A protein has these predicted regions:
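Short beta-strand segments
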Residues: 1-2, 63, 118-120, 162, ...
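Terminal amphipathic helices with adjacent charged low-complexity linkers/tails
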Residues: 1-68, 260, 264-267, 271, ...
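Hydrophobic alpha-helical scaffolding
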Residues: 2, 6, 28-40, 86, ...
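Gly-rich Lys/Arg/Thr-decorated short loops/hinges at beta-loop-alpha junctions or inter-strand turns
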Residues: 23, 80-89, 125-134, 157, ...
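Iron-sulfur cluster-binding cysteine motifs and their immediate structural context
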Residues: 272-273, 303-329
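Short connector loops at secondary-structure junctions
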Residues: 28-35, 120-128, 194-200
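Active-site diphosphate/adenylate-binding microenvironment
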Residues: 63-145, 154
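Thiamine diphosphate
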Residues: 128-261, 269-275, 281
């Protein structure tokens, strides 16, 4: 149980004592109070627990040797590298449909200046990292629009709230959209419609497409928004950065002073790849032709200004030296 206080441990302890059971309970005595429980941390905790209690039926010496060999193998792998591996901070997946949306917001900020952005829990929370660095707050799952209400009155520009479609169904529709409509809030909401709760493994949500690649009409986000009184609403394909920028600009400048919702539509690329992989395999088995697109950089057109890195942090690029004196690389 990561974090402190150890809620589950305390509750189980109370249950045991109320039942007058003297069963020993271990948790934070062998695991750290803070930090992420990585594999190394869990192994160390288990070794400490078994060393203290020495349960029957377990060859403790063999277990300790195994743990030591794991640590040795890790050290050997590190020493085998000529240089330390570069840090790999968390970020959007390759091809993620949400990355271009943040590129559009970045371009918007270059035009209008700083904007208060209320972030949310989900894949889009990676927008708080470089090269975007967007998100003044993250309050809770589906709470971005509700949290923006607390600062909206002191901002010189309209606030932008970002939430995923999973967060929208979980909490955003009630606490955010309904509340903003009721209080006549003048705000902008971007809903990342990727079709799943992607950050936790592409679980299905009410607006997910079904097995026939069709969306259930009664559970569409657009219909839900209209039913609660949203008047200003646009749906934009996430990869169309120019259209997204134009729509964001319109939302910032329009005279309409109610809630403005932009649905950024783009299926989670991981889920899409898994889905079409089965379809392509079936077509190949039937002897049909399957075309797989490939993308690259045209060296004759590229100016080497690194806009692809500065604006989107594209993870698929590799920079190499160039013989062209007019370009850095």
């Amino acid at each position: 149980e990561e974090g402190n206080p150890e809620f589950i441990e305390q509750q189980i302890g109370q249950i045991l004592r109320r039942a007058d059971l003297q069963t020993k309970l271990h948790g934070k005595d062998v695991l750290p109070l803070s930090g992420e429980y990585t594999a190394d941390v869990v192994v160390k905790g288990l070794v400490d627990f078994l060393s203290q209690n020495k349960p029957g039926g377990i060859d403790l010496e063999k277990l300790l040797d195994q743990a030591a060999s794991m640590e040795t193998a890790k050290d050997n792998a590190i020493n085998a590298l000529e240089e330390k591996l570069p840090a790999r901070p968390p970020g959007f997946c390759t091809g993620c449909p949400e990355r271009p949306v943040f590129s559009a917001i970045k371009l918007l900020k270059e035009e209008v200046g700083d904007i208060h952005i209320s972030a949310d829990i989900g894949c889009h929370a990676f927008g708080t990292f470089e090269p975007f660095s967007m998100g003044n707050s993250i309050l809770g799952y589906g709470m971005s629009l509700a949290s923006a209400a607390g600062v909206r009155q002191i901002q010189k520009k309209r606030t932008i709230s970002i939430m995923g479609d999973g967060g929208f169904w979980h909490n955003g529709l009630q606490s955010g959209v309904l509340s903003t409509i009721f209080n006549k809030g003048d705000a902008i909401l971007i809903i990342m419609q990727n079709g799943y709760s992607s950050a936790t493994g592409q679980q299905f949500i009410p607006s997910s497409i079904n097995m026939n690649n069709e969306q259930t009409a009664s559970n569409q986000i657009e219909k839900a928004l209209k039913s609660v009184g949203v008047k200003w609403m646009k749906t934009v394909r996430t990869y169309s950065v120019d259209v997204m920028l134009k729509t964001l600009r319109e939302a910032m400048e329009t005279n309409y002073d109610g809630l403005k919702v932009i649905i950024a539509d783009g299926e989670c690329m991981l889920a899409r790849q898994r889905r079409i992989k089965k379809t392509n395999a079936k077509r190949l088995a039937e002897g049909q032709k399957v075309a797989i697109p490939r993308f690259g950089v045209d060296e004759e057109i590229c100016t080497g200004d690194h806009s692809c890195i500065r604006l989107s942090g594209c993870p698929s690029l590799t920079i190499k030296p160039t013989s062209d004196p007019l370009r850095v690389d």
